[in-house]
A protein has these predicted regions:
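Intrinsic-disorder/low-complexity loop/linker signature
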Residues: 60, 145, 262-263
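Short alpha-helical segments and helix-capping/turn motifs at coil-helix boundaries
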Residues: 25-26, 182-185, 306
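Glycine- and small hydrophobic-enriched segments that form the cores of compact globular domains
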Residues: 161-177, 182-183
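Sequence/fold signature of self-assembling virion shell proteins
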Residues: 215-342
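Long, contiguous amphipathic alpha-helices that act as assembly "spine/axial" helices in icosahedral shell
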Residues: 78-156, 179-183, 187-204, 316-323
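N-terminal alpha-helical "arm" segments
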Residues: 1-40, 329-342
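Ordered core of a single globular domain
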Residues: 178-236
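Assembly/oligomerization interface modules of large self-assembling protein complexes
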Residues: 30-98
């Protein structure tokens, strides 16, 4: 038995709960929802058919010889869930004024909405992790409820992942005389299209900004474009636009996620430089919602299905859960070049 309608819950999560994720906002702006559990990769671009190489992962090892190319892929199903209990509504909430205590009914609503926020954030974290790894490596590991873990590989060319060798390491160069422009141009040439943005972690930024000739060419007066401003909105504390290096927008990212062990980790490994284009055609694909209640309500092809219900018993129990079947697709992984800067 649910106390809130699906329309109310969807309206709340769509309008009130917005977790912006950098790579999703920049490179995966299009969304395609499917009425089937499987995502049809060859139907999402309208151009060249997209295929992915899918390999099983057993005990942490990718068994590529047991994999194969496919154009039909079933996403992992994620459904973060919370239980609300009566004791939570009786106790004072964090930040609540002891002199003006709220009634339990208000606390209950606040806790339920907070639970929905946490569920949305958990799903966005899964989506952003897929997006980041697709950009960094051209592939990612897909997991889900009652789902065999697999590696989804979109076929990145080896030359698009570069590691600076001895003699070429930026950390070995003279800060007053070295000009990184030639290196950056060579890296950009590996991309299948034009490059207009460089995303890096703080380590790479400190190295680059340490070069006198880089600082002289960096244009900090020209404002960022509207697309970039939208992507970094609400991310000001962890994403910084530094300026333009020629036509290249320079962005420093310190975005992070919460790992399974509860620790906070950065999406970008230390020393990572990502070169790409904000016109990249990454696609957020979603398989059908696999819930009988959703089907009865006509909610099948959707990126989210939040629900709230009570179970009758002694005592009764109350739950929230948000379901999704995300699959981030990068049709052309060679649009990006990733450099391990040393």
């Amino acid at each position: 038995m649910g106390l809130f309608t699906t329309r109310q819950l969807l309206g709340y999560t769509e309008q009130k709960v917005k977790f912006r994720a950098l790579f999703l906002e920049l490179f995966f702006r299009r969304t395609v929802n499917f009425h089937t559990e499987e995502v049809m990769l060859d139907k999402i671009t309208g151009k060249t058919p997209v295929a992915a190489y899918v390999s099983p992962i057993v005990e942490g090892k990718v068994l590529r010889h047991r994999g194969g190319e496919t154009r039909v892929l079933r996403p992992g199903y994620v459904k973060p869930k919370h239980e609300f209990n009566y004791q939570q509504a009786v106790e004072r909430l964090p930040g609540e004024d002891p002199a003006q205590l709220n009634d339990p009914a208000y606390r209950r609503l606040r806790i339920i909405t907070d639970n929905l926020k946490q569920e949305e954030q958990a799903i966005v974290q899964v989506e952003e992790m897929q997006a980041v790894n697709a950009v960094l490596y051209g592939k990612y590991t897909m997991e889900g409820d009652q789902f065999d873990t697999v590696e989804v590989d979109f076929g990145r060319s080896e030359g698009n992942n570069i590691e600076q060798a001895d003699g070429k390491k930026w950390s070995e160069q003279d800060r007053d005389t070295f000009d990184p422009t030639h290196d950056i141009d060579l890296y950009c040439d590996q991309a299948s299209g034009l490059v207009n943005i460089a995303i890096m972690d703080g380590t790479v930024w400190r190295l680059l900004n340490g070069f006198k000739l880089f600082r002289e060419k960096l244009d900090t007066r020209r404002g960022s474009n509207s697309q970039l401003e939208t992507a970094v909105k609400d991310l000001g504390a962890v994403v910084s636009f530094k300026g333009y290096y020629g036509d290249l927008a320079i962005v420093v990212a310190k975005t992070s996620y919460v790992a399974e062990d509860g620790t906070e980790k950065r999406y970008l490994p230390e020393g990572t430089l990502v070169l790409g284009n904000t016109a990249a055609e990454g696609i957020r694909c979603y398989g059908a919602i696999q819930d009988a209640q959703a089907l009865s309500e006509g909610v099948v092809a959707s990126s989210r299905y939040p629900k709230h219900w009570l179970t009758v018993g002694d005592p009764a129990r109350e739950f929230t859960m948000t379901q999704s079947a995300p699959l981030m697709v990068l049709p052309d992984p060679d649009e990006f070049v990733v450099v391990q800067v040393k």
